[in-house]
Curated annotation (Swiss-Prot):
An MF annotation (GO) of this entry: DNA binding
Entry's free-text remark on domains: The neutralization domain (ND) is sufficient to counteract the toxic effect of its cognate toxin, although other regions also play a role. Exchanging the C-terminus (probably the last 17 residue) for those in TacA1 (probably 15 residues) allows the chimera to neutralize TacT1.
Pfam family, one: TacA1
Expression induction: The tacA2-tacT2 operon is up-regulated about 15-fold in a relA-spoT-dependent manner within 30 minutes of phagocytosis by mouse bone marrow-derived macrophages.
Keywords associated with the record: DNA-binding, Repressor, Toxin-antitoxin system, Transcription, Transcription regulation
Disulfide bonds: none
Disruption of the gene: reported phenotype: Deleting the operon causes 90% reduction in persister cell formation in mouse bone marrow-derived macrophages. All 3 tacA-tacT operons can be deleted without an effect on growth in cell culture.
Name of the protein described by the UniProt record: Antitoxin TacA2
Matches recorded under SUPFAM superfamilies: Ribbon-helix-helix (SSF47598)
Family: Belongs to the TacA antitoxin family.
Gene (name only): tacA2
Gene Ontology biological process: regulation of DNA-templated transcription
Length: 97
């Protein structure tokens, strides 16, 4: 079983060309977070990658379904208690602290 675990934990190598000043900045930030350079860079890159992919969510629809979607977006919503509450609640940036 140790062989299977070691295979699952194996990491690939990623080489980067970086200016010394940038490397020093990353090292200082990693130290401030109590991490080594590799873990700090990997964590930051992974977070940025996940954010980029979340922002790029794509919904696929055939032309008829997309047209129906647009029609529904243009329709005036029926009044209801939840909508009234939402419209009467100040936005977070409008609320007094």
């Amino acid at each position: 079983m140790p062989a299977a675990n070691s295979m699952a934990m194996k990491r690939e190598t990623l080489n980067l060309r970086i200016k010394p000043a940038e490397r020093d900045l990353i090292d200082r930030a990693a130290k401030a977070r109590g991490k080594n350079r590799t873990d700090f860079v990997l964590e930051a890159a992974r977070a940025a990658a996940e954010e980029a992919l979340i922002e790029q969510r794509i919904i696929m629809a055939d032309p008829e379904a997309y047209q129906e979607f647009l029609v529904r977006l243009d329709q005036t919503p029926s009044p209801n208690a939840a909508l009234r509450k939402t419209m009467q609640t100040p936005a977070p940036w409008e609320q007094e602290k």
